[in-house]
Amino acid sequence: MKKFSRKTEETEVEVVLGEELKVDTGIAFLDHMLKTLSRHSGIKLRVKAKGDLEHHVIEDVAIALGKALAGVDKKGLERFGDAIVPMDDAVAICGLDFSGRGVLVVEGTFGDGEMREEDFLHFLDTLCRNAGLNVYLSVKGSNSHHKMEAAVKAVAISLKKALTKNGNDYRSAKGVLD
């Protein structure tokens, strides 16, 4: 079980990995995306958050979730994962490296729907930087909800593959992963 708490003047967030699936951020679409991430990654996720502005909650949940994921022991993990996820009119393709180097590269646009594109991309980027995930994500489609959900599912499935235990060594020529 990994836990990370973050309390600032703007937000209060607690993320626990390895417990029951329970998410309450006060932002319905963010809750939906976090539950989707949990279900498709196989990571039991408990998130409780409150804050002054949606943007601050979205950002700080991503920071806390990223820090919790960064605490996972990478020894023996597969490290890499990928997925192609179609969803109605949308499709998302993800390649992921749990390298300790947090980089997000996105090809395509999401548009504004239940969550503004800017906030969605900021969530993904902040998550990647804090977790140490290198994520390449390509998305196509016309419905912003479907594109965002397909993207989260693709990241989740890729993460599930990367977190698969396969031996006792680090998957790195350096012999270590940050």
Swiss-Prot record:
Gene3D superfamilies: Imidazole glycerol phosphate dehydratase, domain 1. Its main location: cytoplasm. Pathway: Amino-acid biosynthesis; L-histidine biosynthesis; L-histidine from 5-phospho-alpha-D-ribose 1-diphosphate: step 6/9. It comes from the Archaea. GO terms for biological process: L-histidine biosynthetic process. It is found in: Cytoplasm. Its EC number is 4.2.1.19. It catalyses: D-erythro-1-(imidazol-4-yl)glycerol 3-phosphate = 3-(imidazol-4-yl)-2-oxopropyl phosphate + H2O. GO terms for cellular component: cytoplasm. It holds the Pfam family IGPD. GO terms for molecular function: imidazoleglycerol-phosphate dehydratase activity. Keywords: Amino-acid biosynthesis, Cytoplasm, Histidine biosynthesis, Lyase. PANTHER family: IMIDAZOLEGLYCEROL-PHOSPHATE DEHYDRATASE, IMIDAZOLEGLYCEROL-PHOSPHATE DEHYDRATASE HIS7. Belongs to the imidazoleglycerol-phosphate dehydratase family. This is Imidazoleglycerol-phosphate dehydratase. It comes from Archaeoglobus fulgidus (strain ATCC 49558 / DSM 4304 / JCM 9628 / NBRC 100126 / VC-16).
